Each structure stands twice: as C-alpha cells, then as structure tokens.
C-alpha cells in the first residue's frame, strides 16, 4: 500500500488470494511454491524484521519501515514475472468497472512487448492472447473478476468490496512499470 501499512486480516486475505492465483496461473512447472499459510508468511516476515505489527483500536496493523519498503522493491521485481499477466489484467480495471474481452486482450498485447523487455517473461508475442485468457480464467476462478452478460465483457467486483480491494492491490503491482512505459 502507499503508506506501507495494511490491516492484518486484509493482508491475510491478500496473501491467500495471491497463493490461490499462483496455483491457478502457473508460470512454469519449475516454480516451487511454499506450503505455507498466510499466517506462516506473515510470521516469517516478522522473523526477518521485514514487517512488524502494531495494535490499533480497529485491529492489528502490519507495517513496513520506509527503508525496508525500498529494499522490498527488489524482491517484488524478482517475482513480478510470475504474476505480470494477471496483474496487468487487474490493472485494466483500476479505473473501469467493465471491459470487453476483446479490448482487454488488445490492451495486454499493446503493453506486452514492454513487459517482456523488462521482466523475464517466457511467452512469445503470438501466444499472449492465450496467456491472457488463462489469466482471466484464474482471476474469475478466485472471484476477483466475473463475466458480464453473454460472456462478452469482464466486470470487476462492486467498489468498496473485499474482492475489489484485492483486484486493486494486484493491479497496483504493475502501475510503476506501466508508468515508466508511458513516460519513455
């Protein structure tokens, strides 16, 4: 998040969503996944002094110091390729509620050459429509996107909902890279 703070329950849900997505959208059979729960991941982060928790009247808050947050960008960039396509799909819904399936594929085709240049992405350009469809299937399977009427459109969850927050957080992972593409 922009202030490097998130409620404990929100973080648990976001971690679970990410684990579910990684199991459904497999980058490669060579990628190994830890057999950890969200609480295991949080505990490990605390042991590494990467995150800490404080008690707030509204519940526990997990936060990261500014110095640590800068270092964490290295780790984010190390694994971003695993979720780049689903996160790019999610990014297309940050501002809009609904998008035609064909338009979404066109947008991903438009940015894919830039993404491939910056990240270790294994797919060739001619394969990206199929990969985008796999990402869409994974995102609908975990409930952070749904099909509109007659399956011609994709629809994000209701604004303010837990699923909308998860979609926003996933999409935000690609925003810095997409901003660089736009500026360059």
Labelled PLM ranges:
Residues 1-184:
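Membrane-interfacial terminal anchoring regions of lipid-handling membrane enzymes
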